[in-house]
């Protein structure tokens, strides 16, 4: 068994490696070398993902988390039982949970530390491994939570060009884009089954003979949502939801209860690599990991180290149950 001090030290060192999207190389190298120190072969693939395989008993389980973080450095420090730092919650705490569950368990596991999750998920889209039987993605769900659904993400570009007329005779490109946004947003609603979103970019100016406008929006889409065919789609990742009766979900519920906690099944308004990996391999996928997702991307990102350590034990119990133990 690996000591709690060593697990905390690993996480702190990983968080200390600043790895915003596009700059994951040092963190990937660190994880690879740590696997090798524990006697597990690992490699970095052609897109920068770090992959490790531990052969064991039972179904093949993919444990996938992301190495990259959003930008914004936070001084790394431990205060009592709390570790502060960018990525401590999203998602190096969950990634470290997957790391130690791989090492300490005797399940049949592929570990994947993925790049570009905060971008366009290049790591997940290009992951080349044998088809797993189950997928567990490292994202903050809370020690007693398991995320069974994520909304989709749709990024769209709208462009308007309006021939110049006297300012009193008509609307320009900017006004048309505003009308378009008001039409799209009039039916927004909160919740997992609602559509909502925001304007990511808005640009309008006049050229010699025309008014030009460009608007990029991001929509969070519910299950079953199909965007209009005429839209200029930059990227679309559909919503994903796993059946709560799945053996994977049941293994989490039982393991969390056995740890003395009340299980919570969660559906989130964000999007994660779960949305890509589940459909990519055609198997059940959930997300699990310590941390409060309300702290994601904020200047106050921090993780409770007791919860981190407990999450490792819960995930190891899940892996035992999946192989029939």
UniProtKB/Swiss-Prot annotation:
Its main location: cytoplasm. The keyword Metal-binding applies. CDD domains: M20_ArgE_LysK. One of its GO terms (molecular function) is zinc ion binding. It is found in: Cytoplasm. Zn(2+) 1 binds at residues 66, 90, 139. Its EC number is 3.5.1.130, 3.5.1.132. One of its GO terms (biological process) is lysine biosynthetic process via aminoadipic acid. It catalyses: [amino-group carrier protein]-C-terminal-gamma-(L-lysyl)-L-glutamate + H2O = [amino-group carrier protein]-C-terminal-L-glutamate + L-lysine; [amino-group carrier protein]-C-terminal-gamma-(L-ornithyl)-L-glutamate + H2O = [amino-group carrier protein]-C-terminal-L-glutamate + L-ornithine. Keywords: Amino-acid biosynthesis, Arginine biosynthesis, Cobalt, Cytoplasm, Hydrolase, Lysine biosynthesis, Metal-binding, Zinc. It is an enzyme of class 3 (hydrolase). Pathway: Amino-acid biosynthesis; L-lysine biosynthesis via AAA pathway; L-lysine from L-alpha-aminoadipate (Thermus route): step 5/5; Amino-acid biosynthesis; L-arginine biosynthesis. Its cofactor is Zn(2+); Co(2+). Binds 2 Zn(2+) or Co(2+) ions per subunit. Pfam families: Peptidase_M20. Zn(2+) 2 binds at residues 90, 118, 297. Transmembrane segments: none annotated. One of its GO terms (cellular component) is cytoplasm. The keyword Endoplasmic reticulum does not apply. The active site is at residues 68, 117. Belongs to the peptidase M20A family. LysK subfamily. Catalyzes the release of L-lysine from [LysW]-gamma-L-lysine and the release of L-ornithine from [LysW]-L-ornithine. HAMAP family: LysK. This is Putative [LysW]-lysine/[LysW]-ornithine hydrolase. The lineage of its organism: Archaea, Methanobacteriati, Methanobacteriota, Thermococci, Thermococcales. The gene is lysK.
């Amino acid at each position: 068994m690996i000591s709690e001090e060593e697990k905390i030290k690993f996480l702190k060192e990983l968080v200390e490696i600043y790895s915003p999207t596009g700059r994951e190389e040092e963190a990937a190298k660190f994880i690879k070398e740590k696997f090798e120190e524990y006697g597990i072969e690992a490699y970095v693939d052609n897109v920068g993902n770090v992959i490790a395989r531990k052969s064991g008993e039972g179904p093949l389980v993919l444990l996938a988390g992301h190495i990259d973080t959003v930008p914004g450095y936070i001084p790394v420090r431990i205060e009592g039982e709390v570790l502060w730092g960018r990525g401590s919650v999203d998602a190096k705490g969950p990634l470290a949970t997957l790391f130690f569950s791989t090492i300490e368990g005797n399940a049949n596991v592929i570990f994947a530390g993925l790049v570009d999750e905060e971008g366009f998920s290049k790591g997940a889209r290009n992951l080349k491994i044998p088809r797993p039987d189950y997928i567990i993605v490292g994202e903050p769900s809370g020690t007693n939570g398991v995320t069974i659904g994520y909304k989709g993400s749709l990024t769209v570009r709208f462009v308007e060009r309006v021939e110049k007329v006297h300012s009193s005779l008509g609307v320009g490109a900017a006004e048309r884009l505003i009308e378009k946004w008001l039409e799209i947003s009039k039916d927004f609603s909160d919740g997992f089954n609602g559509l909502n979103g925001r304007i990511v970019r808005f640009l309008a100016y006049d050229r010699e003979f025309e008014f030009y406008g460009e608007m990029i929006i991001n929509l969070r889409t519910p299950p079953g949502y199909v965007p209009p065919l005429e839209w200029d789609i930059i990227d679309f990742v559909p919503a994903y939801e796993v059946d709560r009766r799945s053996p994977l979900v049941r293994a989490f519920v039982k393991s969390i209860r056995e740890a003395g906690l009340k299980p919570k099944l969660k559906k989130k308004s964000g999007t994660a690599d779960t949305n890509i990996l589940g459909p990519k391999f055609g198997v059940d996928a959930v997300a699990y990991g310590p941390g409060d997702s309300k702290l994601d991307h904020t200047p106050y990102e921090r993780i409770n180290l007791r919860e981190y350590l407990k999450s490792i034990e819960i995930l190891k119990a899940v892996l035992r149950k999946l192989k029939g133990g």
